[in-house]
């Protein structure tokens, strides 16, 4: 189940491999930066690429629901926070562009160009846009949020609403 849709669990096969990435001798001959680079590389993965390459079909009729939580900027019109999802579709409420998520985890525009068939490419495009906004001193985000406390590990307690502001001054 992807982190953006925990409410509807999926029955998908899970595969993992434990591998030794460095020996004691290799570690002794490396700097901390080199060791960290090897660790970062070994922990890098792409679930969508793995799904496609291994033919893992996810056929649930709700497979795209919640995807708008991570793919929040429309690549067709550039508007942020107007994406929505339902069933197998992701769509922009601002310009109407719609994408269908196939059973191999790829996106296809229902009309016109498919800007990003591979979900991580869309996500990285958004990250690049945010990075450019930060570097230009233009980044800002503001939203009303629900605030909870977790005094015990088994239940959140609602505390109320708050205004979250993230910009160069805050």
Where are these regions (language model features)?
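Rieske [2Fe-2S] iron-sulfur-binding subdomain
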Residues: 8, 12-28, 32-46, 63, ...
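Short secondary-structure transition/capping segments
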Residues: 38-46, 95-106
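Hydrophobic residues embedded in beta-strands of well-ordered beta-sheets
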Residues: 90, 169-170
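Mid-sequence helix-capping/hinge segment at a functional interface
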Residues: 49-57
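Long, charge-rich boundary regions
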Residues: 100-169
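Short linear motifs in intrinsically disordered
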Residues: 62-63, 80-82, 160-165
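A cross-family acyltransferase "interaction/gating" segment
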Residues: 1-29, 33, 37, 58-78, ...
């Amino acid at each position: 189940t992807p982190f953006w849709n925990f409410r509807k669990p999926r029955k998908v096969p899970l595969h993992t491999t434990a591998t030794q990435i460095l020996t004691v001798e290799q570690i002794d001959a490396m700097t901390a930066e080199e060791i960290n680079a090897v660790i970062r590389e070994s922990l890098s993965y792409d679930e969508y690429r793995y799904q496609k390459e291994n033919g893992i079909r996810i056929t649930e009729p709700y497979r795209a629901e919640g995807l708008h939580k991570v793919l929040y900027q429309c690549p067709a019109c550039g508007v942020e926070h107007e994406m929505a999802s339902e069933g197998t579709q992701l769509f922009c409420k601002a310009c109407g562009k719609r994408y269908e998520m196939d059973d191999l985890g790829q996106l296809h525009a229902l009309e016109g160009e498919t800007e990003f068939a591979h979900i991580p490419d869309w996500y990285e495009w958004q990250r690049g846009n945010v990075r450019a906004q930060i570097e230009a001193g233009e980044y800002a985000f503001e939203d009303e949020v629900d605030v909870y406390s977790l005094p015990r590990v088994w239940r959140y307690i609602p505390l109320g609403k708050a205004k979250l502001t993230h910009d160069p001054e805050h």
